[in-house]
Amino acid sequence: VTAPSYVNGILDQLRSRHPDIYQMLLYVEQPFPYDLEKNQIDVHSVSARKPLFMDESAHDWRLVRLGRQLGWSGVALKTCKTQTGALLTLCWAKAHGMDLMVQDLTNPMLAQIPHVLLAAHAGTIMGVETNAMQFYPDASLPEQDVHPGLYRRRDGSVELSTISGPGFGYHLGGIRRELPPPVVSVGA
């Protein structure tokens, strides 16, 4: 989709034909091409109807800046695209009044911890998207033994009370994960 009028038409029809559903719609996510630099589409008319979130386009805070200039009103943060990148984008977006969400591309095992910690402190529109337990339910069993509430959803929520201390609160000493032997050893 490259025409804001197309997205606006869908939203306008939804608002007139099904106003209850339109009211429940929290946001629109990345309906336009991912490469913002090549596709500099003015989307202010869409974000005037519903919050418009960058997702795949938001892999660098400078692209988030460009997106905001084009009319995007929110950004999806993903620690799987680097923790530092997510933090830089978070800071820039917050400083410029953009809405935030934290999503994953399936963060199992230890990756789940910084992911949910970012969401807990970011001020998102509604919690965190975390789907590793859905797609890879057994991948995080060693971590789940130490952080049970983090790897099991209850009533749509995860629980972070076991995360504390240094190193993102991993508690690595208690996690019994067997790793394969290293491929390369330096200085052995």
Model-found features: residue ranges?
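Catalytic core of soluble alpha/beta enzymes
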Residues: 1-105, 110-112
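Flexible C-terminal active-site loop/helix
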Residues: 105-188
